[in-house]
Amino acid sequence: MKNNEKVSDSFLTSSGKELSEATPSASSYTTVVRDKNIKGVVSNWLAEMKLRHKPLGFDYQGVEILEVKPEDLTSVAIALYAYGFNYLRNQCAYDVSPGGNLASVYHLTKLDADVDQPQEVCLKVFLPRENPRVPSVFWIWKTADFQERESYDMFGIYYEGHPHLKRILMPENWVGWPLRKDYITPDFFELQDAY
């Protein structure tokens, strides 16, 4: 390198563009992720089918997030299965805030042999802390079996219609729901007391 050459602080992509030009800025990313007024393909289709839901925007990977009420979950889930979302990739739950609502979350994928990037959608069902009940989707996607049981075991969400809803990680006589934010951990628990 010669003394009078300026060293560039930027990096070039394989196309020769500066990395800053090729990569979306944080502000443009935030606009897509946080703008709840933008409806995605799945939300538009559900609206055409007159199925109640609320668009919540997109996650950081561009996956559409929809809120569904517990009483509408079965009809929306069946419609999405018919639309082609044939795989429940993940079902989980979380505690929104101490003393607040719980959420049951469903990550659905549209698997097709001809597609490199399968379409995905995320459903969220918010439930009251006292007596959180939601229909099981086990009858639509069998992969919900152990996942709904884990959500029941850790958060106390009751999945109505699940064929074998019981604790899966904790002993049957465990008191409370360990992953709730207001859960008080016991001082000790002896395993021999569980059997």
UniProtKB/Swiss-Prot annotation:
It is an enzyme of class 7 (translocase). One of its GO terms (molecular function) is quinone binding. InterPro entries: NADH_DH_suC, NADH_quin_OxRdtase_su_C/D-like, NADH_UbQ_OxRdtase_30kDa_su, NADH_UbQ_OxRdtase_CS. Keywords: Chloroplast, Membrane, NAD, NADP, Plastid, Plastoquinone, Quinone, Thylakoid, Translocase, Transport. One of its GO terms (biological process) is photosynthesis, light reaction. PROSITE patterns: COMPLEX1_30K. It is found in: Plastid, Chloroplast thylakoid membrane. It holds the Pfam family Complex1_30kDa. Its main location: plastid. It comes from the Eukaryota. GO terms for cellular component: chloroplast thylakoid membrane. It catalyses: a plastoquinone + NADH + (n+1) H(+)(in) = a plastoquinol + NAD(+) + n H(+)(out); a plastoquinone + NADPH + (n+1) H(+)(in) = a plastoquinol + NADP(+) + n H(+)(out). It is a peripheral membrane protein. Its EC number is 7.1.1.-. NDH is composed of at least 16 different subunits, 5 of which are encoded in the nucleus. NDH shuttles electrons from NAD(P)H:plastoquinone, via FMN and iron-sulfur (Fe-S) centers, to quinones in the photosynthetic chain and possibly in a chloroplast respiratory chain. The immediate electron acceptor for the enzyme in this species is believed to be plastoquinone. Couples the redox reaction to proton translocation, and thus conserves the redox energy in a proton gradient. Belongs to the complex I 30 kDa subunit family. This is NAD(P)H-quinone oxidoreductase subunit J, chloroplastic.
